């Protein structure tokens, strides 16, 4: 996740002011200080407030690491019995319209709107389609299909990048 944060910064046109090792140590220290048995960790980086406007290339780069107690995105019951998904009217953007491989706050808006709409209609999450109309992911979960032979199939990830998918695709568990 830390390497992805660094790469996302580069994709968005800035370098983080800390090394990979410094960020990982800060993450371990922050998680340890909170003492949660299960936690959600979100490192964030953003441009400073020295300039206001579309071009803010001369601003400082800030970094924070937030930690929340978070046992699971879905309840144990939902995880055992499955969740109800509503196909979102919003789609993951075309890679040529947004920096889709960057973990960028602006891209969360699509999932936030989709999740809210699904919940208003009695669903646990939204099924996100890519810009071509193919299944991409849920707003808070990856989508994997297992065929009769036990082969795992994942969506084509050209409009999003997910660490869990990369781990699975590389043979990790």
Per-segment meaning from a language model:
Residues 16, 36-42:
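Ordered, amphipathic secondary-structure segments that act as subunit-interaction surfaces
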């Amino acid at each position: 996740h830390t390497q992805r944060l660094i790469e996302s910064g580069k994709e968005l046109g800035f370098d983080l002011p800390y090394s990979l090792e410094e960020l990982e140590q800060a993450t371990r220290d922050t998680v340890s200080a909170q003492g949660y048995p299960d936690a959600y960790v979100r490192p964030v980086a953003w441009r400073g407030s020295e300039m206001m406007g579309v071009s803010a290339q001369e601003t400082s780069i800030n970094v924070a690491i937030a930690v929340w107690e978070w046992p699971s995105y879905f309840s144990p019951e939902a995880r055992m019995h499955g969740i109800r998904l509503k196909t979102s009217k919003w789609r993951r953007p075309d890679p040529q319209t947004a920096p889709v491989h960057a973990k960028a706050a602006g891209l969360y808006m699509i999932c936030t709107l989709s999740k809210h709409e699904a919940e208003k209609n009695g669903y646990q999450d939204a099924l996100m389609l890519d810009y071509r109309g193919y299944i991409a992911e849920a707003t808070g979960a990856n989508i994997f299909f297992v065929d009769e032979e036990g082969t795992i199939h994942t969506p084509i990830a050209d409009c999003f990048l997910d660490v869990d998918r990369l781990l699975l695709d590389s043979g990790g568990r």
